[in-house]
């Protein structure tokens, strides 16, 4: 069987109350040459059961580590390019994957990462991403061959594993940009660890002058 063009990796933790919106946004994509990988980390609810409604690639672990969970997704991935989605985020456009696919093909072979715009879900500000310095992994398509060649892995830390990943990958990567807002970053989910972490990421973004 030919490898899919995209592997979409979704790490999840007790996400039964929110994950459907993101999974539905993937299911609605007009471009269908992708595999969906959901890695459930210590889920005590029906997250895995819901994930099985959308994909056969559901892996359950008990690590309490988003970094290790994402690494498991990378281990399972067979796609040419990697996309990440948090369990409380979603894709805005139904043709998002098609737009990313077309931009990759138009770009030739001289880049490793395609970055695109994202939207802050609750604040209501559309933030157009123009540079490579924001640490997020979910507003980028990553060439799997590149990640494997440089041995890119997420650190096993309690939170902000994307910081270490960005510090390792960004200096080695060749970037290309798609000027379209495709991803909704729901950083304001109340009462959650994710909410606190994502608010911290917003502060780092503002400190770097990208906001």
Named regions from a protein language model:
Residues 1-209:
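Nucleotide-sugar donor-binding/catalytic module of glycosyltransferases
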């Amino acid at each position: 069987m030919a490898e899919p063009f995209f592997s979409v990796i979704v790490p999840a933790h007790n996400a039964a109350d929110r994950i459907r919106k993101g999974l539905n946004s993937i299911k609605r994509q007009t471009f269908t040459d992708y595999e969906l990988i959901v890695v459930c980390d210590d889920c005590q609810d029906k997250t895995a059961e819901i994930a099985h409604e959308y994909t056969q690639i559901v892996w359950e672990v008990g690590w309490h580590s988003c970094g290790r969970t994402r690494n498991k997704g990378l281990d399972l991935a067979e796609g040419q390019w990697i996309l990440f989605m948090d369990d409380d985020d979603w894709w805005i456009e139904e043709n998002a994957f098609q737009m990313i696919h077309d931009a990759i093909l138009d770009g030739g072979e001289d880049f490793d990462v395609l970055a695109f715009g994202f939207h802050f879900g609750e604040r209501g500000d559309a933030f157009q991403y123009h540079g490579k310095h924001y640490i997020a992994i979910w507003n980028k398509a990553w060439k799997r061959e590149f990640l494997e060649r440089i041995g890119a892995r997420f650190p096993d830390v309690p939170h902000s594993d994307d910081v270490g990943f960005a510090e390792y990958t960004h200096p080695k990567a060749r970037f290309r940009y798609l000027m379209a807002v495709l991803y909704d970053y729901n950083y304001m989910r109340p009462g959650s660890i994710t909410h606190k972490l994502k608010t911290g990421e917003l502060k780092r973004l503002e400190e770097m002058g990208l906001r």
